[in-house]
């Protein structure tokens, strides 16, 4: 549906620009003998999780980052998972890493995430780093919110002074995005809505920018969007036919000024900023 009226916020092209920059920075680190390494911890054989992890390592190869994979069987104990996390925390080759979610039900996700060394938290979702974001202290930033801000800037969508309506209160997007957008460097005004918000269209029609991250198929429709507004589609869910769809309905393209496609919008940037967090930490370690 792109090209009907709205300008496409192209996440793939923007990711490619970031990768060109990262490749140069990784080459400079490698010359100093400090090649960054990204680790992944994958438990079990969920096809979606396997695909995500494969994608992350393929991205690493494109920019010259070393891959460190820890693939574990689905029936491991919490103690065995903890031991793997401790090993990566201590491993000097591993600059940063992620524990791929969801974990099997018998494992404690929050305990696993809290065990990650906050300095090696490539996702930017460790409680310490989310706390630093609240305090406006330097820390690895959550990848999806950072990707959203970068994508808006790349296409010169005005953020300072803008009213942004975020739909979704999850820890990976909705909550931290509000914190990023209200920093002095962004200066947006944020309204945080969710699936239980009453009269949601009243909020969205007032918005300069809408970020849909609720995981409800096509919940944002054309009549909810002010003409010319920017609409970012982060939601991922399946429709009745099992097809992956976003939170933004196709008719929004006819009304909005900018729309991020889904797939091909924010997703590629989430992966790009995962690598950026790792490269930035390698550079900080190199500076001493």
Curated annotation (Swiss-Prot):
InterPro entries in the cross-refs: Aminoacid_DH-like_N_sf, NAD(P)-bd_dom_sf, THF_DH/CycHdrlase, THF_DH/CycHdrlase_cat_dom, THF_DH/CycHdrlase_NAD-bd_dom
GO annotation, biological process: L-histidine biosynthetic process; methionine biosynthetic process; purine nucleotide biosynthetic process; tetrahydrofolate interconversion
UniProt keyword annotation of Zinc present: no
Family: Belongs to the tetrahydrofolate dehydrogenase/cyclohydrolase family.
Any one of the GO CC terms: cytosol
Alphabetical UniProt keywords: Amino-acid biosynthesis, Histidine biosynthesis, Hydrolase, Methionine biosynthesis, Multifunctional enzyme, NADP, One-carbon metabolism, Oxidoreductase, Purine biosynthesis
Functional pathway: One-carbon metabolism; tetrahydrofolate interconversion
The protein, known as: Bifunctional protein FolD
One GO MF term attached to the UniProt entry: methylenetetrahydrofolate dehydrogenase (NADP+) activity
Catalysed reaction, written as an equation: (6R)-5,10-methylene-5,6,7,8-tetrahydrofolate + NADP(+) = (6R)-5,10-methenyltetrahydrofolate + NADPH; (6R)-5,10-methenyltetrahydrofolate + H2O = (6R)-10-formyltetrahydrofolate + H(+)
Residue positions binding NADP(+): 168-170, 195, 236
Record-listed E.C. numbers: 1.5.1.5, 3.5.4.9
Role, per record: Catalyzes the oxidation of 5,10-methylenetetrahydrofolate to 5,10-methenyltetrahydrofolate and then the hydrolysis of 5,10-methenyltetrahydrofolate to 10-formyltetrahydrofolate.
Quaternary structure, from the entry: Homodimer.
Keyword Methyltransferase: no
